[in-house]
Design a protein with these regions (language model features):
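Short beta-strand segments at enzyme active-site cores
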Residues: 88-100, 196
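Short acidic/His/Gly/Ser-rich catalytic and metal-binding motifs that mark active-site loops
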Residues: 56-59, 100-102
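Glycine-rich, phosphate-binding/catalytic loops in enzymes
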Residues: 64-68, 108-109, 187-188
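A short alpha/beta connector and helix-capping loop motif
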Residues: 44, 62-83, 87-92
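Active-site-adjacent betaalpha module
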Residues: 2-47, 78-86, 104, 111-236
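Acidic/histidine-rich helix-loop elements
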Residues: 20-26, 58-69
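Short, conserved beta-strand edge motifs with alternating hydrophobic and charged residues
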Residues: 50, 91-94, 144-145
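Acidic-leg catalytic submotif of subtilisin-like serine proteases
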Residues: 47-57
Length: 236
């Protein structure tokens, strides 16, 4: 019997303190980044990715709703409207799982911790549907993914290659989970990733750390307005 002998699980901060870890004093040259990475958004080779803007993550009061969800929707719609008006492909990615979670693998174990049993993203369920205030259209492209990373187990890369896409604008929820893992995989597949920081949200407290990580190692971090300005400047 465990009784009162069960130990409290240490937090990451407590573990770091235990091994005397402190972050290194690293400075990233953002000015140099602007010089060497100015042309990541070529409009004719760019697509807009909108990741997991489903009711489960966006609807106020939902089990995994991002607190900044309403503001994120506004910024995503600005990008969607601009891209549609300028023939830039818009791709809506939706987490899609079996009702029993049998296709989720290891993710199913974590899901039991994160959300209640009735929050499975089964196709056609309320939580699975895109948030109704988004400006999606039937003529847009829709991709279903079974796990966090939108490239895993989906036809996303095949769609992008067939369209001749080289640069990807990332938006959606959660910044530090599905958006983040997809962006890193995109980088390793030699796509140029740009993330619209105000068009992404999260129910978790790690957005700032993920943003710094992306900006340092994987791609560019801009606002929706800055991305639109670059697209306008580079338009043929």
């Amino acid at each position: 019997m465990m009784g009162n002998s069960a130990k409290k699980v240490a937090t990451c901060a407590e573990r770091a303190k235990a091994v005397n870890y402190s972050p290194p004093a690293f400075k990233y040259n953002l000015e140099l980044q602007k010089d060497v990475m100015p042309l990541l958004i070529a409009p004719e080779k760019t697509a807009l990715l909108v990741i997991d803007m489903q009711n489960l993550f966006t609807e106020p009061g939902a089990p995994l709703a991002a607190p900044d969800g309403p503001q994120v929707v506004v910024q995503i719609n600005k990008l969607v409207d601009y891209c549609r008006a300028h023939n830039i492909p818009i791709i809506w990615v939706q987490e899609t799982n079996r009702k029993d979670g049998s296709d989720m693998g290891m993710m199913a174990k974590h899901w039991k911790i994160l959300a209640p049993p009735d929050s499975m993203l089964a196709e056609g369920s309320h939580w699975w549907e895109l948030y109704p205030e988004l400006h999606n259209e039937p003529t847009d492209i829709y991709v279903k993914k079974p796990k966090y990373n939108a490239f895993w187990g989906s036809d996303l890369e095949a769609v992008l290659r067939s369209l001749g896409i080289e640069s990807l604008i990332f938006t959606g929820i959660a910044f530090d989970v599905c958006v983040y893992t997809t962006l890193i995989d995109a980088f390793h597949r030699d796509f140029n990733p740009v993330i619209a920081v105000d068009a992404t949200g999260s129910p978790f407290p790690y957005k700032e750390a993920s943003m710094w990580h992306i900006e340092t190692l994987w791609g560019r971090v801009l606002t929706a307005a800055e991305i639109i300005t670059e697209l306008q400047a580079l338009a043929p």
